[in-house]
Amino acid sequence: MPRATADMKTFTPDSSIVSDVIPSMNYGDRNKGRLADMILLHYTGMPDVEGAIAQLCTPGTDVSAHYIVLEDGRIVQCVPEAKRAWHAGVSFWAGEEDINSCSIGIEIINRGHDWGYPDFPLRQIAALIALCRGIMLRRKVPSHRVLAHS
């Protein structure tokens, strides 16, 4: 798994269940001081974990997520929850016009439909549930604002 380099800013994880921090430089401030009150789940759709982490953490790719949940259940944090990760693109939902500013983005390592769409391992699902529960408690996210898309 790629490691953070000395020139990358490091931060303290927002959750005690985070096993590693690999900082992404692809983030910004939340618009108008907006607080995150939504969780958006994605799967990576890439053939391997190294490629997915490189895509999310390499400066200039203009994509990131707050968390990555690995197949073995480990959780990597790439962007502090207080910041705006770039995982939702130009998107709209239930009157929200800037999903990146109101959400915590979680990428779930899975090759997706282009590579046979394997089942999500039970360890990965358990870790994802624990992570989401913690975020929901910390940020007071109601269950109807936990969303997923491919």
Q: What are these regions, as identified by a protein language model?
A:
Residues 2-142:
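Active-site-adjacent loop/helix surface patches within enzyme catalytic domains
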Residues 145-150:
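Short, intrinsically disordered, charge-balanced linker/junction segments flanking boundaries
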